[in-house]
Amino acid sequence: MTNNFDAIRKYVEELGIPQQYDTRCDLYFDIQLIRRGKDHPGLPAANYTFKTYYIDCLDNFDKYKEEIIKCCEMFGLRAYVAVNVKSKYKACLETIQKYAHNLTNGESRKPWRVFASVCGGQDGEEKRWVVDCDSDDCDNLEEYLQNIILSIRQCESAYYDPIVMTIPTRSGYHIITHPFNINRFKKICDAKSITPPEIKKNHITLLYENIQKL
């Protein structure tokens, strides 16, 4: 089982998500409940987004916690959370623009998907990256993780420390970072003869899963 609710709650609070709903706050983040094909190899078309929550205050994050956990355990889902908080105003504006574009081109089927599509692809207000350290990339995961963290800190960045936090995942860790010099990072990894992990911009990290190993 992986339960990152406490760590993520603190993380989004530091990014400006208020405790209670505040009309003056433009920020939100989304949580997706996803069924992964590798968790259900016997199911056809197993990759599926079961539900998405749009959260703009910690009260709602707390409110939906139990529901998210129950859904994950009942249906074998993983809960993922966006690492970048987003703008409600920009989401509304981009949705209107996309509706207008679709209608101009004669496309009006399934309009309810437009908002979800906009939110899923929307840039964050403050860019954070996910560095995916997987146990498949190394023999010793903990040693590999520390090597990657040290290598990131050796790169040029606009921030004193590009490392924000480390999140446990089902098969390793996600290092959430500020942007850093990727080319420099790859050269450092090559010099150390370590496999550079995948770097994912505007991505998601694991909030919760309790899937039994096959």
Spell out what each predicted region is.
Residues 156, 189-199:
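A common structural junction motif
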Residues 1-169, 180, 187-188, 204-214:
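Signature for HUH/AEP ssDNA processing cores
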Residues 176-178:
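Short hydrophobic/aromatic beta-strand micro-patches
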